[in-house]
């Protein structure tokens, strides 16, 4: 019997098995669709396909950094349960897959599936792992960042395998880049804990900032109502939420207000130049709350909470003898954006006993 493309398409859609596997199964079954499904299941491929409708929202985030800190890859591979995520075989699968993505320069899931790992097509290798481990597994996403001779990349994955970060930096020289690797890893650890969304306030959309500013003021004003009732100090209500709202005109206005304040306090003008920089720094701290929450450079460093990441980078640049600029930031948190399946255990038991 002739095996048509439509037959292969139908079998693939109903089982989730690979195109060539479906074609071979239909050939062995002489075109019998049900028998072809049985053949796939007997080979373990049908078993993998049968699990494909179950949501995989657990798993591992894996990070692979090359020995010279010039290339780093992060991946998220999902399983259905945390139990499987702790399985050594699954952990090895995640590690091997991430290393394969990096060494082969793979950019997309489609490229990954058609690549070859240990002499086997990756799609088939992965389905074999699904059949062996016994749960639906999904390579959900991955990304690789690279650096030239004057750049450095590093990464960090939290011990529970649920959060991973990559950061890439451009440096003034190759020597500075070589010295900065451990510092960049420390920044990755910070980002894993503090969850910045972007590198800088320059990466924030202005419309988003305006909406968030309205929400921020409302939040602080609401909290102030309770603080006032309790007789506690009130929150400062900021004029701005991000540096992207503070241009030259806004800074000039703030400086003038500081000068008027100093004049009212009777401070001699000859010492204003020593006082104003500190007050301007305080002005920025009070009016960049959104940057402190969402941007890497605007956050206070977990290892020294008196300084922002931007300030720490400036200090490290001076220490190492050349400029360091963060140019790439990737953070994966396991299952973000996925809806975790909640089983109705009673309904499941009832279904099984009929």
UniProtKB/Swiss-Prot annotation:
UniProtKB keywords: Cytoplasm, Elongation factor, Protein biosynthesis
InterPro entries found in the cross-reference section: EF-Ts_dimer_sf (IPR036402), Transl_elong_EFTs/EF1B (IPR001816), Transl_elong_EFTs/EF1B_dimer (IPR014039), Transl_elong_Ts_CS (IPR018101), UBA-like_sf (IPR009060)
One annotated Gene Ontology cellular component of this protein: cytoplasm
PROSITE patterns reported for this sequence: EF_TS_1 (PS01126), EF_TS_2 (PS01127)
Superkingdom per UniProt: Bacteria
Involved in Mg(2+) ion dislocation from EF-Tu as annotated region, ranges: 81-84
Subcellular location as annotated: Cytoplasm
Gene Ontology molecular function terms on file: translation elongation factor activity
Keyword Protein biosynthesis part of the UniProt annotation: yes
Keyword Protein biosynthesis tagged: yes
Signal sequence segment: none
Primary role: Associates with the EF-Tu.GDP complex and induces the exchange of GDP to GTP. It remains bound to the aminoacyl-tRNA.EF-Tu.GTP complex up to the GTP hydrolysis stage on the ribosome.
Stored HAMAP family: EF_Ts
Family statement drawn from the similarity comment of this UniProt entry: Belongs to the EF-Ts family.
Name of the molecule in the record: Elongation factor Ts
Gene: tsf
